[in-house]
Amino acid sequence: MNLVVYLIQLFLAALLHLSAVKAAHIPKEGGKSKNDVIPFMDVYKKSACKTRELLVDIIQEYPDEIEHTYIPSCVVLMRCAGCCNDEALECVPTETRNVTMEVLRVKQRVSQHNFQLSFTEHTKCECRPKAEVKAKKENHCEPCSERRKRLYVQDPLTCKCSCKFTQMQCKSRQLELNERTCRCEKPR
């Protein structure tokens, strides 16, 4: 009896997966022949940064769940995708929401049952500077000293270098701060 229920659930899951694949397919508009040229504005609008239905692998969202198999193995989620007008920008979510979906969770030869998983869906998208571009702009200062980096702190806005140790820290050890070398030294 359990095998029959499992086979029915497997069939329904496969059917759901196939319908999701069909829904994710972008159909040709108006029965155009394969030699028609798609106008620029159509191409531009379809490629813009926006939320779209995407198939997302469950294991991608839950990488630590390797001892289980999920049916279906992927789900349809609204996610940000598309192109930005500048290569330094990327399409990223600005608003999200959680959605809970019921899937079949199978542990090989042990158990199977319906299981609820929570996923993040994107509701709004924007083109924003890529993370590596931000990092390059933020770190525009030359290092204080190649040989003694650990002795200095640097103001990221002004790039001004100052000693990591303070006069008070040096005095607490009966030493004086040498501001040229940024080291605590014995008084002369």
From Swiss-Prot:
Give the main localization category: secreted
GO BP field: angioblast cell migration from lateral mesoderm to midline; angiogenesis; artery morphogenesis; blood vessel development; blood vessel endothelial cell proliferation involved in sprouting angiogenesis; branching involved in blood vessel morphogenesis; cardioblast migration to the midline involved in heart rudiment formation; central nervous system vasculogenesis
**Keywords, comma-separated and alphabetical:** Angiogenesis, Developmental protein, Differentiation, Disulfide bond, Glycoprotein, Growth factor, Mitogen, Secreted, Signal
Q: Which SMART domains match?
A: PDGF
The UniProt disruption phenotype note reads: Morpholino knockdowns show a complete loss of intersegmental vessels throughout the tail at 28 hpf.
The protein's matches in Gene3D superfamilies, at most eight in alphabetical order, are given as: Cystine-knot cytokines, Vascular endothelial growth factor, heparin-binding domain
Q: What are the disulphide bonds in this sequence?
A: 49-91, 80-125, 84-127
The residues that the database entry marks as glycosylated are: 98
Q: Which domain of life is it from?
A: Eukaryota
* Localization, UniProt: Secreted
N-terminal signal peptide:
1-23
Any Pfam family: VEGF_C
One Gene Ontology MF term = growth factor activity
Q: For this UniProt entry, what's an example GO CC term?
A: membrane
Tissue-level expression reads: Predominantly expressed in regions associated with active vascularization. From 15-16 hours post-fertilization (hpf), expressed in the anterior forebrain, the mesoderm underlying and lateral to the anterior hindbrain, the mesoderm underlying and lateral to the posterior hindbrain, and in the ventral medial portions of the somites. By 30-36 hpf, expression in the somites is decreased, while strong expression is observed in the region of the developing glomeruli and in the anterior portion of the pronephric ducts, the pharyngeal arches, and the brain.
- rRNA processing as a keyword of this entry, yes or no, is no
Task: Name the job this protein performs.
Answer: Growth factor active in angiogenesis, vasculogenesis and endothelial cell growth. Induces endothelial cell proliferation, promotes cell migration, inhibits apoptosis, and induces permeabilization of blood vessels. Required for intersegmental vessel development in the tail during embryogenesis. Acts both upstream of kdr and tie1 to stimulate endothelial cell differentiation, and upstream of gata1 to stimulate hematopoietic cell differentiation.
Q: How does it assemble?
A: Homodimer; disulfide-linked. Isoform VEGF165 binds kdr and kdrl.
- Name the family the entry cites: Belongs to the PDGF/VEGF growth factor family.
- Supply the name of the protein: Vascular endothelial growth factor A-A
Species name for this entry? Danio rerio (Zebrafish)
